[in-house]
Amino acid sequence: MLQGPRALASAAGQTPKVVPAMSPTELWPSGLSSPQLCPATATYYTPLYPQTAPPAAAPGTCLDATPHGPEGQVVRCLPAGRLPAKRKLDLEGIGRPVVPEFPTPKGKCIRVDGLPSPKTPKSPGEKTRYDTSLGLLTKKFIYLLSESEDGVLDLNWAAEVLDVQKRRIYDITNVLEGIQLIRKKAKNNIQWVGRGMFEDPTRPGKQQQLGQELKELMNTEQALDQLIQSCSLSFKHLTEDKANKRLAYVTYQDIRAVGNFKEQTVIAVKAPPQTRLEVPDRTEDNLQIYLKSTQGPIEVYLCPEEVQEPDSPSEEPLPSTSTLCPSPDSAQPSSSTDPSIMEPTASSVPAPAPTPQQAPPPPSLVPLEATDSLLELPHPLLQQTEDQFLSPTLACSSPLISFSPSLDQDDYLWGLEAGEGISDLFDSYDLGDLLIN
């Protein structure tokens, strides 16, 4: 702020005087100028950045100096050569990203009468910008891909059909391959790997139907599990009951009485506990069954469809239930007989009801042939059950056909005589020097 001379300012405590009006030229003389600044020393300023010495100016130029005249006027020196180019220095925008200014849209030219100018019609052979757009080309490419077999498309054929350059096709395939919708199957061949294009339109209905069937199968499986559990519990109670153990057998008539077994081949298997049964995959030609047991022998019988029965009970009377069919062992003579050793017969089984024509004979005991020792008796290998004491008709003329031959006396373990030792049990083996040592 410029202040006037002190002579013009009123002193404190004095009455201000009226200053006559003066013109600006009278107030500020023409020879008055700004005071000259005193030169500062070189150590007064501290350089912030290392500075290099400016290049020496060419002779006759004044580009690096701005001399002041006696009245503070800038003196410009004209260069001897070419004039320097004018450059606008943006000191405030250093380090900021340059944002291009949005150009002001130009308004449409409107005729004086207010009607828009008519557009110039294009030639019929010229394509519009929409026809050559990448979006429309992608739609056409996807349509060709959907019509191809197994989703495999030849890029050369697609470029010919779409009438475009091959690089335009590559622009589409690069994007689709990047989002994992297609994959390169071979050279110039791609395959669609996405979903939704080649799916059956009736798939949702089929999926719903399969879900309903799966639900029904789960209900059926649950019902079968309950039945299996109930049958297992009933079978456990049946087998653990002592009164039912003696009746744990089935007859031929019982098997043939089952309606589902009619006109079918029935094979009866009598196996010890823990017998393993394996049935491989069934084929149309044959059926294979594998039985394996480590607890004892397995007996297999065939139940024929037709059995020859006697004409009438009066023509051929039934034998007594107290007698059994003679076995091959009983036909051989024996040196001695022990009447105290008896085999239980079928007399304990209730006899059939008597008929008016013939009364049942009184029960009797038939002694079996005994040997010198109990070890010489052909003891059965399996525990005797109630089915071994049936009537003679079922025992002698049983309709069951055994697949294995009947056992003879050579298949049993016999005892030793008085003059025989333990080595006689191994007479069929050549032990050599083992007996000497």
Swiss-Prot record:
Q: Write out the annotated subcellular location.
A: Nucleus
- Give the span(s) annotated as Dimerization: 197-289
User: Pfam families attached here?
Assistant: E2F_CC-MB, E2F_TDP
- Give residue spans, biased composition: Low complexity: 315-330
Classification via CDD domains: E2F_DD
Instruction: Show the InterPro entries listed in the entry.
Output: E2F (IPR015633), E2F-DP_heterodim (IPR037241), E2F_CC-MB (IPR032198), E2F_WHTH_DNA-bd_dom (IPR003316), WH-like_DNA-bd_sf (IPR036388), WH_DNA-bd_sf (IPR036390)
* Keywords for this protein: Activator, Cell cycle, DNA-binding, Nucleus, Phosphoprotein, Transcription, Transcription regulation
Name any one GO molecular function: DNA-binding transcription activator activity, RNA polymerase II-specific
Designated name of the protein? Transcription factor E2F2
